[in-house]
């Protein structure tokens, strides 16, 4: 995602971590082109964590909520979705008249599926899995979160 953000703000210098999302990294440009050939009217909506070769094929690049909003506002009836498969439920619920195709063979992230409402409830109720950080780090994190919320307004 750092690479994508740096292309959107070219006047800024970014120091980008060399990490990646294992799910978005598996979106293969050749597979996307195969799906595009099978569904030529479909728009390809990609998450910015996909590789740049994949993003180059996209009609729209945006966050999960951006993809959901774009599909809802678009007049198009078919979409290829380049992000985690959990988004399909929301897309199909909001847009029953539209068709969505995955941009990867296995679109589900096993790590995201480990978090359930029951597990969150249990952690909050039982006060387990608490994370401790030193005050210096916590202060910086709070400022970053407050700024993020401010920008979202």
Q: Which residue stretches match the model-derived regions?
A:
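The feature marks the mature, well-folded catalytic cores of soluble enzymes
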Residues: 1-153
